[in-house]
Every structure is written in structure tokens, then in C-alpha cells.
Amino acid sequence: MLIREDYQGCYNDPVEKHYDFQRFSEDDGQKVLFHGIGCLENPRHKAALKHYKKKAFYNLEHPCAWYGSYEYMSKSANMDGYFDKVFTICPYSAKWLNEVQQRNTFVPASIPFNKNYLVSEKEDKVHDVMYWGGIHHPTHVNFVDSMRRFNYNFLSLGWQHWAAPFRTRQFVQEYAPSITHQNVPRAEMWSLIRKTKINVMANLLYLSESQVEIIKSIEGWSKNEAFAHLDQRILPQYKTRPIECAANRSLMLVKRDPWNINELWFSPDSEFLYFDKDEDLPDMIEEISSNWEKYEHIAENAFKRATQDYTVEGFVQAVERGLDD
């Protein structure tokens, strides 16, 4: 199977740039996997490989595509029928699109990790807790507030990337100094994760009113389970944090939500922990960080699951099997 990549439009150093897909790329003239947003945006890729009998795309942006431009929605929904299989990280969009299009094109997929970047030996936990990401919702503010009295790290691309309500001068003056690392390379981030007991996260997208209206303009939008709580302006999004934390032995402390998408790939209680209310976070961080020996096995279980079930090799094999169906 040939693998064609184009990362135009991606972040500077996302985890998928470290997959090294080309080590698995063998052109048989029959099957091809497209990876990267640029493969959708640049028509030359489809034109050059249209003669292949079996074509797949790995879609990492669902459900974000559904509040973008209609042109991009069409590409992301495979409206031209170019791809035989689309492996997507949004299981709800997969089910919805298959029902709407009356095909079996879309396949729920995990986010893998390149085992060549694994560190087999455990490292000393010198940090209590970490959050990496932006501030786009009061929940993220609460994450930072909850961590600040501990030995914490807050990794961000910078306040310039935060949602508009959190870019006011007053807010930036108060919270930007809490950033401990800005726009760090992936390898450096993984090193920090390995030295950290807890990673707090929410597998949600927080929408603006205009984004909600765009989604509601899509015919049949209400049949997508991902849109079941638009009244709260939230969508489920399976981010890369879970696999990156699991592969680096940091305990996932996940905010419970209406979908709990993390349970598709990891088991609650044995491989990660939930918290229900933001105000519970400080006490949970205190409990786990002070009694790490009672909780370390959870991070270790997640590490075993990630390194056995969610490797890049396994993903490539799943794509090939899917194209053979």
C-alpha cells in the first residue's frame, strides 16, 4: 500500500508528523492511504492517484469540519465518493455519514503512537500535574487555577491562540504568566509527560454561537449524535492527549461529559480516572499526587493498552484490512 502525506494546514509539530508512515509505504499500484489535510485541500493528490483501485483517507479533524466552510465540509464528507474508506476519529460522524450516504465508507479509528518513541524504563515523577492546550472555556481556566498550588506545568501555543473572550488585556496579564512552556517540540513535551503524575483533560470542543448556527444549517444535522448537546455549545472530540499521556505513563484525569469518548479506547477506573466537577480537581490532584503508589498502576495499565493496541503498525494493518473488505 502506498502512503501519500501532505501536512499543509497542520500545526507545526503534531503527533502525526512523528508516525513515520513512509517506512510502511510500498507501492503495489492497487492501494493508497492519504494522510494530512493537504491531501484534501490540494487536488493534485487525488488527480495523481485516481487510478488506484482502493483508496483510503485518515481523517483527524472530525467533527471540526462541520463548522467550517461548505466546500471543506464536502471534501471531509467524501461527497465525491473518491475514497473507498475514510478512517475517522469521530465515531458519531462515521455512523451519521454512513447512514446519510447509505454506504459503509466511514470507519471509527483510534489515534496511534509510534512505538519507536517509547521509553521502556519508568522515569521519576518530579511534577504533580500538567495541562497542555489553550484556554477556550471557563473549564480550562479552572484547570490552570486548580494546578497552580502544585508542582505543575501548563503547556500552550501562547495566549494569542486562546479564544477571544480569554485574550483581553486583563485576562492575559493574569494567566499568561502561568504558561511554563510555550510551543515546545513534541519530544520535549513527551519527556515532561513521562516525569508528570497527572494530566488533566476534557475531550470536548467548545463552540461559538456562529459555529452552532453553521452546524444547524447542515441538512440532517440532528441525526449526528455528536450534535446532541448543541444547546450547551459542546461537541465530543477525541484529541491526541489520551494516547500521548498513556504512551508516556502519565495518569489521565478526564472530565466526564455526555459522550465519554475516552471509553472507546481506554477503560475507566483501571486505565484512567474521571472527575465530574471542576471544583473537585484540587482535591483529586492532591490525593493522587500525594499517594502516587496507589494510582501508578492505572497509568501503567494505560501504557500497556496503548503500546499493545494503538501502534502505528497496527493502524496501517487495519487500513489495509479495511481496503480489502
Language model features with spans:
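Nucleotide-sugar donor-binding catalytic core of glycosyltransferases
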Residues: M1-G29, F34-A47, L60-W265
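Short beta-strand/loop segments at the ligand-binding rim of alpha/beta enzyme cores
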Residues: H51-N59
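Conserved acidic donor-binding segment of nucleotide-sugar-dependent glycosyltransferases
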Residues: K239, F272-D278, E287-W292
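Short, contiguous hydrophobic alpha-helices characteristic of membrane insertion segments
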Residues: M252-L253, S270-D276, A318-D325
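Acidic, glycine-centered active-site loop in nucleotide-sugar glycosyltransferases
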Residues: I261-F272, M284
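A charged, aromatic-enriched C-terminal amphipathic alpha-helix characteristic of glycosyltransferases
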Residues: S290-R321
